Amino acid sequence: MLLGINNDPEANHKLVDEISGKAFSWYQRLVSKNFGSSKYILKSIDSNMFEINLQEYNDVVRTNFDLRKNGIVFFFRFKQQEFAESCIYEKITIQSSDRIFVIQTDKNLYKFEIINTKNHLSFIKNLFNFKNNKKLKS
């Protein structure tokens, strides 16, 4: 679910926590070896309710991913607005090629440019581990 954070930050952060779970503490991150991802460049968003058009935007929109207990979260800024995408693992599909990383959530399709391939592969492994562990515990 894509949320505009600026309107009501407290309520929107609470909604993100309800969907994907709370962010891990530093200790939990060390134990689970979950440090999120490296930076990605957001290239496009298909079918979003905020009508974000990155093709006509001159600045670079960067983001990184946070793996949580129930799902994935990422934040980005576009034209002085902060947005968050939060989705449970069961509704996420991904595709990855040499330089492009595509994530389809429950409502939107995102294309990212991969900046660091080695870190990207490590993140994909962590994502699959979290997704599979979630399925095993259910």
Annotated model-derived regions:
Residues Y40-V60:
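A low-complexity, Ser/Thr/Gly/Pro-enriched, surface-exposed linker/loop concept
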Residues M1-I45, K91-S138:
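Acidic, Ser/Thr- and proline-rich intrinsically disordered linker/docking segments
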Residues E10, E18, E51, E56, ...:
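Glutamate identity and glutamate-enriched acidic tracts
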Residues S38-S47, N70-R77:
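Generic short beta-strand segments
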Residues E56-N64, R68-Q95:
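Phosphoinositide-binding peripheral membrane targeting modules
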